[in-house]
């Protein structure tokens, strides 16, 4: 799998136009070195933004850790990925996000997830730090009632908007389904046919 990530980074594999862009420092350095970075300052959101597909497999926590650790091997990044996959699976079973979060077992680093419903937009940070990204994405989802509202709220937070929207959008897709995504948004997807051939 690591080799496929290198093919993506260095050869543009799996991209619509054969080009990669906006690659995080930790991701680039980890793939160049050949192993994930495990220091405290390598907790960007690079592994979180790509981990959702594991929610649709039988991957356990150690598998999620292994996939995150291709680029982001620190415990903070790994926990974010494990929490996200767990939340996604619970949503797939029909559980409500508010109930999931209130009963979530986390380290102190992610303790605010249990009280996200009490926070205002001013309390939310949407930086590239993995803790901020997960909190912001879940807050947007928790305080919205539709797919478009979730995404627009994430984008309007500022900072690392594309990743926060991607992380929030993955879970919003589970909740609202394909029919919840505006047709004009779907129509603008580049290489939509390729995506559809993979999904349907």
Where are each of the predicted segments found?
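Structured, active/binding-site neighborhoods that engage oxygen-rich ligands
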Residues: 1-200
